[in-house]
């Protein structure tokens, strides 16, 4: 690749004594693997910038599964994700590494990813709000074309107070059954707009994205979730006044 591309590092691991093997999310070519030769060496000027959550301009070469990094320049400082918000960032990175096939472009999803990181860093909304919006954007970019606004059985628009049960590959069908796969019409409308006005719609969004992402993730648990649980367990208990 001759030109520069905007990228983020999803994950990196040591390769040989001085190099790094990087999983990158690029604006125009999707997820790719890149070998950064000598990046861990003492004299490397890449040490500090090849980190998650740092916007980068990158050039690479090669036609195989693993490209060779040629140049990398930070566009700005890393987005400030700290504390519990850091684990939200690690979660979306792991999600992309697990779900996206290499070499498939997702330019709209790249923008959604950047927006998610910006919302997390700003702390204006809860991390859950940012994560649910991103998960729904990811599903849409993967071709998950479920219709949230119409009953899959009758074709009628969903009604706020009615209950609809999700059926994989079919959609939401009006039902009297209320269980893990059931959602109200109001909750479905919030999924369609990716806006969650209260805790009920936010919880419903989490329940749905867990259901919808499960086939993509298989049975292997996400490491970032376990790391977050460990972080929570290590926090001191708040004393009651």
Swiss-Prot record:
Q: Which Gene3D superfamilies match?
A: Nucleic acid-binding proteins, Recombination protein O, C-terminal domain
Which SUPFAM superfamilies does this chain map to? ArfGap/RecO-like zinc finger, Nucleic acid-binding proteins
Quick one: a GO cellular component term? bacterial nucleoid
**Superkingdom of the source species:** Bacteria
One of the protein's GO biological processes: DNA recombination
InterPro entries linked: ARFGAP/RecO, DNA_rep/recomb_RecO_N, NA-bd_OB-fold, RecO, RecO_C
Quote the Pfam families the UniProt record gives: RecO_C (PF02565), RecO_N (PF11967)
- What keywords tag this UniProt record? DNA damage, DNA recombination, DNA repair
Q: Which NCBIfam families match?
A: reco
**Its job:** Involved in DNA repair and RecF pathway recombination.
Family under the similarity heading: Belongs to the RecO family.
Q: What is this protein called?
A: DNA repair protein RecO
Where does this protein come from, organism-wise? Photorhabdus laumondii subsp. laumondii (strain DSM 15139 / CIP 105565 / TT01) (Photorhabdus luminescens subsp. laumondii)
Q: In the UniProt record, what gene is named as encoding this protein?
A: recO
């Amino acid at each position: 690749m001759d030109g520069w591309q905007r990228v983020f590092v999803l994950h990196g691991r040591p390769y040989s004594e001085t190099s790094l093997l990087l999983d990158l999310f690029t604006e125009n070519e999707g997820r790719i693997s890149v070998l950064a030769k000598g990046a861990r060496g003492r004299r490397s000027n890449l040490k500090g910038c090849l980190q998650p959550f740092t916007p980068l301009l990158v050039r690479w070469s090669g036609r195989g599964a693993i490209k060779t990094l040629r140049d990398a320049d930070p566009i700005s400082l890393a987005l400030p994700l700290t504390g519990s918000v850091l684990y939200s960032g690690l979660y979306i990175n792991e999600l992309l590494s697990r779900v996206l096939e290499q070499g498939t472009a997702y330019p709209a999803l790249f923008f959604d990813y950047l927006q998610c990181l910006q919302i997390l860093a700003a702390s204006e909304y809860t991390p859950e709000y940012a994560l649910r919006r991103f998960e729904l954007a990811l599903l849409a970019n993967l071709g998950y074309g479920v219709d949230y606004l119409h009953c899959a059985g009758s074709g009628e628009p969903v009604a706020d107070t009615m209950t609809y049960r999700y059926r994989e590959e079919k959609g939401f069908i009006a039902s009297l059954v209320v269980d893990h796969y059931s959602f109200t019409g109001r909750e479905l409308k919030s999924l369609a707009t990716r806006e969650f006005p209260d805790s009920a719609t936010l919880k419903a969004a989490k329940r749905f994205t867990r259901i919808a992402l499960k086939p993509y993730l298989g049975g292997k648990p996400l490491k970032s979730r376990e790391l977050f649980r460990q972080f929570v367990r290590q926090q001191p208990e708040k004393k009651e006044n």
